[in-house]
Design a protein with these regions (language model features):
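Glutamate identity and glutamate-enriched acidic tracts
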Residues: 9, 18, 33, 41, ...
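N-terminal regulatory/effector-sensing and dimerization cores
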Residues: 51-149
Length: 186
């Protein structure tokens, strides 16, 4: 009986990832051009509905190649299955995010995701509007000076370019949270 229950949970999660993956191309992909110094940058606007403060999305496919862009929100991209690359604006930095690792970005940090493989790449994204993040989560992270700097820097520097690459997430806590969020959001 327990195995059947676990199987149903996994089916529900698999169905949620399928739904979010199918919805991904139809999100509000609104890129606006902004002048930054002597160059023009693409800025992705909020991908969710106007009344949403936090949203979950998922890319599922064998190949992803995004245009280099910035975004007006915090994001956490979790490599649920497979690996992908992220090209960061910071020092023309490239980082590979392996399965069970996270790439966390600030508002307006420039980046582009890319990857391809024989099997599907699944990236689950959690997007959080800046205002809600500052109002809700800031107190929680205030004890860690580095994290506090990472999340506060965009309030001072509109075009901050920091990212966090979380590796060695062996305990599964983030994976479990991302799975729950994907299932509930779908």
């Amino acid at each position: 009986m327990l195995q059947g229950g676990l199987l149903m949970e996994n089916m529900s999660l698999a169905q949620s990832i399928e739904k979010l993956g199918a919805d991904f191309p139809n999100l509000h992909w609104d890129f606006q051009e902004h002048r930054i110094g002597n160059r023009t940058e693409l800025i992705s606007q909020w991908l969710g509905d106007p009344d949403e403060d936090i949203m979950v999305c998922a890319f599922k496919g064998k190949e992803i190649h995004e245009k280099f862009h910035r975004q007006d929100f915090f994001f956490l991209n979790y490599a649920y299955s497979g690996a992908y690359g992220a090209q960061s604006d910071r020092f023309d930095h490239h980082v590979t995010i392996q399965e069970n690792e996270c790439y966390i970005g600030q508002p307006f940090s420039g980046y582009a995701l890319h990857g391809s493989g024989e099997k599907d790449i699944v990236i689950i994204g959690v997007l959080i509007r800046k205002e809600i993040f500052y109002r809700t989560f800031l107190q929680t992270i205030s004890a860690d000076r580095r994290l506090l700097h990472f999340f506060l820097d965009p309030k001072i520097n509109s075009y901050s370019d920091e990212f966090i690459h979380l590796t060695d997430l062996k305990d599964g806590a983030i994976r479990t949270q991302v799975e729950l969020m994907a299932t509930e959001y779908a």
